């Protein structure tokens, strides 16, 4: 079924599930139509295949669509690389040819921590109270104002949601759609002031590899922004320092009836180890600049157990202390056992880009001006996560992060206001004008 037929069907649907669905009109903005189309293309990355780029072949499905659309919009060099990087260049407007080129970057992939295939977007006219995205097994999939107080400010808005069975994919297809809509505006009116623009859509951001293979020299930009944040107005130039710790526990299986003094249960070793890490430094107890240990997964038998943690902190010294505590916990257990049964492997992932971006305050100032020019109050926040901009900044391309307008990423309650999609495209237009 052609995408426009799917779009027409989705937007004409007026079934009620705890909220009023908006009927289609002939005035749907370009960015909305693009967004609804892009989220229906599955692009989940796969951490199990992190040794290859892209980690999932499905990311080419969107990459090829975007490359073709960019060519149709006049970016003659637009292409998708063998690793699913979509790159294109837009010439500067008249009078801005001598200005430094500016990059705009978003990522193709969606996370695998929630179902991401078969996304069925729809538009809910939100009237307050619980936001009900859909139903699963006869039960509403809802977000309450108690859990998300920001909903109180969105009454009367049209919100794009999934049907409650999958994530939506606003992270980061909202950013993709907003950049593409800006390119479409420039194609329609090349006199809109802008420097030469580099456009890039990267794969595998969700598994920490999004910027690794971007050829910065060929990209040719002095500065860049990722469009990968949350609610409208977010402006981020600090992120976590990040590492992954894989901890292995070797047990000794003995018949339980003969186990005294002989059995070493690897599953229990894991429990002992996990208890040595401060529980108040788990994600569910932290906010702002507070770092954490996050147990992402564990598998255990009596003979062997493996636990995978991610470790995060904005402060480099506190980050190192967290890594040192993991090593110390393993050493303590090994000393108690009199044998090296606990081993730790730590893999560095990314560093706090504030180390680089703080030397380019003009990038923050110009972004603030662009938000304010569009009637949006900028909110400068630390990223409680990572972004392609972290890797790029340390590779020589200073790269703060801008909002997309989305909420509740990485879950079935994810949504984005239609007005935020439009407004963020306006912000990007104002931003590039200030570099012209």
What are these model-derived regions, one by one?
Residues 48-49, 77, 191-196, 279-294, ...:
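Flexible, glycine/charged-enriched surface loops at secondary-structure junctions
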Residues 28-56, 161, 350, 410-411:
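N-terminal capping segment at the start of a domain
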Residues 148-151, 157-170, 204-327, 331, ...:
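Midchain, well-structured core segments that form catalytic/ion-binding scaffolds
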Residues 50-99, 103-105, 109, 120:
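A non-catalytic alpha/beta surface segment that caps or lines the substrate-entry region
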Residues 96-196, 201, 221:
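Active-site metal-coordination/substrate-binding segment of hydrolases
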Residues 301-303, 377-430, 435:
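Zn-dependent metallopeptidase/amidohydrolase metal-coordination segment
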């Amino acid at each position: 079924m052609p995408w426009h037929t799917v779009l027409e069907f989705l937007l004409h649907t007026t079934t009620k599930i705890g909220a009023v669905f908006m009927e289609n009109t002939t005035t749907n903005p370009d960015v909305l139509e693009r967004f609804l189309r892009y989220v229906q293309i599955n692009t989940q990355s796969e951490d199990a295949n992190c040794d290859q780029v892209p980690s999932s072949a499905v990311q080419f499905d969107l990459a090829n669509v975007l490359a073709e659309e960019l060519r149709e919009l006049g970016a003659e060099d637009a292409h998708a690389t063998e690793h699913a990087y979509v790159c294109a260049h837009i010439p500067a407007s008249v009078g801005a040819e001598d200005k430094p080129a500016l990059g705009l970057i978003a990522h193709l992939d969606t996370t695998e921590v929630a179902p991401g295939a078969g996304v069925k977007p729809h538009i809910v006219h939100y009237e307050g109270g619980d936001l009900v995205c859909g139903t699963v097994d006869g039960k509403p999939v809802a977000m309450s104002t108690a859990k998300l107080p920001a909903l109180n400010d969105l009454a009367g808005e049209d919100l794009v949601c999934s049907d409650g069975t999958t994530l939506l994919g606003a992270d980061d297809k909202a950013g993709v759609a907003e950049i593409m809509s800006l390119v479409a505006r420039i194609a329609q009116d090349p006199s809109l002031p802008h420097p030469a623009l580099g456009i890039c859509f990267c794969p595998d951001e969700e598994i920490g590899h999004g910027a690794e293979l971007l050829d910065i020299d060929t990209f040719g930009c002095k500065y860049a922004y990722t469009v990968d944040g949350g609610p409208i107005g977010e402006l981020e130039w600090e992120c976590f320092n990040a590492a992954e710790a894989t901890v292995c526990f070797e047990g000794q299986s003995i018949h339980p009836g003969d186990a005294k003094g002989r059995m070493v249960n690897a599953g229990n070793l894991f429990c002992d180890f996990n208890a040595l890490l401060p529980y108040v430094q788990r994600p569910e107890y932290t906010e702002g600049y507070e770092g954490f240990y996050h147990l992402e997964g564990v598998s255990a038998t009596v003979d062997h157990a493996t636990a995978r943690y991610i470790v995060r902190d904005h402060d480099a010294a506190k980050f190192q202390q967290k890594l040192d505590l993991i090593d110390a916990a393993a050493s303590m257990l090994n000393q108690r056992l009199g044998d090296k049964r606990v081993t730790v492997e730590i893999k560095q992932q990314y560093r706090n880009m504030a180390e680089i971006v703080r030397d380019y305050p003009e990038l923050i100032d110009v972004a603030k001006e662009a938000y304010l020019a569009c009637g949006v109050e900028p909110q400068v926040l630390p990223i409680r996560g990572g972004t392609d901009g972290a890797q790029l900044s340390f590779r020589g391309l200073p790269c703060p992060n801008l909002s997309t307008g989305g909420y509740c990423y990485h879950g079935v309650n994810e949504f984005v206001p239609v007005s935020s999609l439009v407004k963020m495209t306006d912000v990007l237009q104002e931003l590039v004008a200030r570099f012209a």
